[in-house]
Amino acid sequence: RSIHHLLLIAAALAFALAARSSGPLFRVHLPVSLTTLAMTAALWAWHVPALYNAALANMALYWGMQITIFATSFAFWLAIQRAGVMGAVGGLLGGMVQMGCLGALLTFASQPLYVTHALSAPSWGLTGLADQQLAGLVMWVGGMAPFAIGGLWIARRAWQRQNATGNSTNSINVLRELQAK
């Protein structure tokens, strides 16, 4: 499931990139802080064991989980694209930290949190706890990758803009430009 959720977040990024120049619906500017909080709330809420187990037992809740994770991630990636350098980096850092914390929580839990996976893990040759720890590691390490890649992309854009204006590329000027935005 953790890979599935990461794929939803990655798909939301792809759709947000495609929607950049689309119709007026996608031109709404939401603050990065709001979209970061919304995405964090959706991910963390759906990982509360009672909600997660309920979603796996009920098709309507399951699709609600998928839609809210995708929609909040889509809004987050749209906001990141439209934000200034500092806002985008802050949002990416916030997204990365919350993903890492959720992954670490799953990895270091002392007992399985999700009944469904604890019961199905033995068919894969894993204990319920080992399955959860593996999922936590995937979320912790793999889940932080899109945010890190986004940060590198933003830094590259900022440096390209700076080079286009003829400013020096030393680190002090880069920091001044980032603070000005």
Language-model segments: which ranges?
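Alpha-helical membrane segments of multi-pass proteins
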Residues: 1-181
